[in-house]
UniProtKB/Swiss-Prot annotation:
This is 26S proteasome non-ATPase regulatory subunit 2. One of its GO terms (cellular component) is proteasome regulatory particle. Keywords: Acetylation, Phosphoprotein, Proteasome, Repeat. One of its GO terms (molecular function) is enzyme regulator activity.
Length: 908
């Protein structure tokens, strides 16, 4: 047989025209071809390979002969050869390689065969061969006419190839062609279970996403695969457009519920921002311990569910959701870390380390501006610790070292020190409510609001204390009480509080500042809820204001209130944008841009970012035309109405890029590059906004490249760029105690020792860096960076939008707006409890989180870990896992408050 085979070998090239489309090379002619061919083959093919090749060729020949009785054994043998070739992952299996030139001939043979079993059998073999030919989806074509035997028998590579062709074919068929889609669906129903069983869950998901049939996943998933599938689906969410992203989340949520993983399902319902679903998941869970864990998660996210009183352990659940214990748990952590000792601003400034010939930057005369800075620093550093050395002992002495509005902020800082401690805190603030100074009184009102931030209390002390002052004759009193209510009820969407506040906007006595703060407070309370009353009242206020009033710098808070009301709501803002069309420029584009970016906050929406970049690059033509006009006139205009500059909305667009991209790593990286360009080549309005955008994209995450950029621009020629850069450094490092940043800020303090405004910013940044002595964070993302807290984003935006006009707002009289940051303050700790909610110290490994999406097996989720005993602090990008098998966590993400259960199999 071998002889015969060898004689026939030269015949092979004559079939090449048929196989040519598959990519065989052109051959030289006649005799040289035979000689060259023989030589090459001698070198290339080992004896075994040669035998295999000849055998395969003979089988193909047989199929071409007239004797049909030989077909079946020949096909059987071909199939055996193809299957038994153990494939190395890097090269094409030998039988497929040798059969490739005969592909065309096999197709001809197939066409000429009589219908029946053999013909279908041949189709199977051609389908497998088609993998090696880059052609017209023939792998799929022949599969569909083949014998329909099990996919698995042909191996993984074949299944993967087929899946790709199914997806392409599906997209070319219209919805109308349902009949043609049927056989494809049948194939998909074979492919998906195969992938699930062979560690290729992500390929199954990809296929179903391509053909938009994600719901089919649920029935094929088993206990072992669901976690991986859901992880893959949720990590795809950032990369698919509306409405597919919510379809993926809902699919993953369905899978979690199928396996009774309630905490994970709840997390996805919060991502979807679907409150009915949240309530449904919470109430359908019958395990009280898991319900308590979910209550902790809701409390952290700032969501409160009104439970019916007959729910088991109603009081406990309500208390957990209300964050009543937040303060005592936080103080327990502080005691554990031994950081209860109150700090004074000088401990933070470390003026003794400055080698200054004229004494340190802090040793100049007591100026009101520096005392104000110290009030903020003192508040930030001792936030939530309940004691300090300036205010809690004998506060009056310190308060009177401040002037006017400074007193307001100084008094309010007491609220920050007593943060979350509703019962103990209000009694300490109470005495200042009787002060003869309106500013101190107003500050004390704001402090009452701050103390209640993020904590619910059924007695509603904040509402009771502050409601009388909302329409007070003095606008100063209004400011403190309204902003206080905004912070105390942020995210609650409480109708009673809103009905109290909304009339203030239209009140004739309200200054523009009060109207602005009211819009802000209402936006914070109704954050992300699309509340109709808030929308209509703010829109009405904007319509009623004259053009000059809208040029007031505080007018920017009106559209911000609108934006916060629609935070993350996407297309729901079309009507508002249409309503704003009647407002005159430049306020219109400012308001439009601001509402638009809020609606897509954290969505990672690429198209929106592109629109914003267009806005950023708009200004150049108009600038050149303006330059011919009288420059002096332009200067006067700048002085009078800086915020009404035509480019004001560009600053918002820059912030918007950060706001949209911050939810997702790749988008954030791309935004960083863009900001680099804007800083170098942008207009002044743009450059002032870039540091703020950098702060937003990296809150409480002191990345060196961002710090270096900010450090460079903290010496910028444009003072507003340098103010914003310095403050941004504080936000980027907030609550981290980052030593490198602290050193940078000390150098800046020396550099700006003679410039009170810059020094004020440096002090603020120093206070933020040591926020809560390094135990708090301002980052709006939690639960492994999956969930964005809308209340936190509202707080950050309030501050950053105000910084767009830093000179008139923050360095002017409205520095109290910095307390917006309170809404974003959260302890960055991990505390473990047993089922009775008693603290339970266990050892945990804390390390850098590793992305394990789509990896096979059970890869490690953290790297470079250290083992600690809870309670512990978690830095940005760190993840914790239990280091003992004695307990099992009720939720897979160890962050915040976690309940542990005894592992029933531990003693075995």
């Amino acid at each position: 047989m071998e002889e015969g085979g060898r004689d026939k070998a030269p015949v092979q090239p004559q079939q090449s025209p048929a196989a040519a489309p598959g990519g065989t090379d052109e051959k030289p002619s006649g005799k040289e071809r035979r000689d060259a061919g023989d030589k090459d083959k001698e070198q290339e093919l080992s004896e075994e390979d040669k035998q295999l090749q000849d055998e395969l060729e003979m089988l193909v020949e047989r199929l071409g002969e007239k004797d049909t009785s030989l077909y079946r054994p020949a096909l059987e043998e071909l199939r055996r050869q193809i299957r038994s070739s153990t494939t190395s992952m890097t090269s094409v299996p030998k039988p497929l390689k040798f059969l490739r030139p005969h592909y065309g001939k096999l197709k001809e043979i197939y066409e000429n065969m009589a219908p029946g079993e053999n013909k279908r059998f041949a189709a199977d073999i051609i389908s497998v061969l088609a993998m090696t030919m880059s052609g017209e989806r023939e792998c799929l074509k022949y599969r569909l006419v083949g014998s329909q035997e099990e996919l698995a028998s042909w191996g993984h590579e074949y299944v993967r190839h087929l899946a790709g062709e199914v997806a392409k074919e599906w997209q070319e068929l219209d919805d109308a062609e349902k009949v043609q889609r049927e056989p494809l669906l049948t194939l998909v129903k074979e492919i998906v279970p195969y992938n699930m069983a062979h560690n290729a869950e992500h390929e199954a998901c990809d296929l179903l996403m391509e053909i938009e049939q994600v719901d089919m996943l649920e029935k094929d998933i088993d206990e072992n695969a669901y976690a991986k599938v859901c992880l893959y689906l949720t990590s795809c969410v950032n990369y698919v457009p509306e409405p597919e992203n919510s379809a993926l989340l809902r699919c993953a949520l369905g899978v979690f519920r199928k396996f009774s993983r309630f905490p994970e399902a709840l997390r996805l319902a919060l991502m979807l921002n679907d409150m009915e679903l949240v309530e449904d998941i919470f109430t359908s869970c019958k395990d009280v311990v898991v319900q308590k864990q979910m209550a902790f998660m809701l409390g952290r996210h700032g969501v409160f569910l009104e439970l019916s009183e007959d729910v088991e352990e109603y009081e406990d659940l309500t208390e957990i959701m209300s964050n009543v214990q937040l303060n005592s748990n936080f103080l327990a952590l502080a005691r554990e870390l031994d950081i209860m000792e109150p700090k004074v601003p000088d401990d933070i400034y470390k003026t003794h380390l400055e080698n200054n010939r004229f004494g340190g930057s802090g040793s100049q005369v007591d100026s009101a501006r520096m005392n104000l800075a110290s009030s903020f620093v003192n508040g930030f550093v001792n936030a939530a610790f309940g004691q300090d050395k300036l205010l809690t002992d004998d506060g009056n002495k310190w308060l009177y070292k401040n002037k006017d509005h400074g007193m307001l902020s100084a008094a309010a800082s007491l609220g920050m020190i007593l943060l979350w401690d509703v019962d103990g805190g209000l009694t300490q603030i109470d005495k200042y409510l009787y002060s003869s100074e309106d500013y101190i009184k107003s500050g004390a009102l704001l402090a009452c609001g701050i103390v209640n931030s993020g904590v619910r209390n059924e007695c509603d002390p904040a509402l009771a204390l502050l409601s009388d002052y909302v329409l007070h004759n003095s606008n100063t009193m209004r400011l403190g009480s309204i902003f206080g209510l905004g912070l105390a009820y942020a995210g609650s969407n409480r109708e009673d509080v809103l009905t109290l506040l909304l009339p203030v906007m239209g009140d004739s006595k309200s200054s523009m500042e009060v109207a602005g703060v009211t819009a802000l407070a209402c936006g914070m309370i109704a954050v992300g809820s699309c509340n109709g009353d808030v929308t209509s009242t703010i829109l009405q206020t904007i319509m009623e204001k004259s053009e000059t009033e809208l040029k007031d710098t505080y007018a920017r808070w009106l559209p911000l209130g609108l934006g916060l009301n629609h935070l993350g709501k996407g297309e729901a803002i079309e009507a508002i944008l249409a309503a704003l069309e009647v407002v005159s420029e430049p306020f219109r584009s400012f308001a439009n841009t601001l509402v638009d970016v809020c609606a897509y906050a954290g969505s990672g929406n690429v198209l929106k970012v592109q629109q914003l970049l267009h806005i950023c690059s708009e200004h150049f033509d108009s600038k050149e035309k303006e330059e011919d006009k009288d420059k002096k006139e332009k200067k006067d205009k700048d002085k009078k109405e800086a915020p009404a500059d035509m480019g004001a909305h560009q600053g918002v667009a820059v912030l918007g890029i950060a706001l949209i991209a911050m939810g997702e790593e790749i988008g954030a990286e791309m935004a960083l590059r863009t900001f680099g360009h804007l800083l170098r080549y942008g207009e002044p309005t743009l450059r002032r906004a870039v540091p703020l955008a950098l702060a937003l994209i990296s809150v409480s995450n002191p990345r060196l490249n961002i710090l270096d950029t900010l450090s460079k621009f903290s010496h910028d020629a444009d003072p507003e760029v340098s103010y914003n850069s310095i403050f941004a450094m504080g936000m980027v490092g907030s609550g981290t105690n980052n030593a490198r940043l602290a050193a940078m800020l000390r150098q800046l303090a020396q550099y700006h020792a003679k410039d009170p405004n810059n020094l004020f910013m440096v002090r603020l940044a120093q206070g933020l860096t040591h926020l809560g002595k390094g135990t708090l964070t301002l980052c709006p993302y939690h639960s492994d960076r999956q969930l964005m807290s809308q209340v936190a984003v509202a707080g950050l935006l309030t501050v950053l939008v105000s910084f767009l006009d830093v000179r008139n707002i923050i360095l002017g009289k409205s520095h109290y707006v910095l307390y917006g940051l309170v809404a974003a303050m959260q302890p960055r700790m991990l505390v473990t409890f047993d089922e009775e909610l008693r603290p339970l110290p266990v050892s945990v490994r804390v390390g850098q989180a590793v992305d394990v999406v789509g990896q096979a097996g059970k890869p490690k989720t953290i790297t470079g870990f250290q083992t600690h005993t809870t309670p512990v602090l978690l830095a940005h990008g760190e993840r914790a896992e239990l280091a003992t098998e004695e307990f099992l966590p009720v939720t897979p993400i160890l962050e915040g408050f976690v309940i542990l259960r005894k592992n029933p199999n531990y003693d075995l």
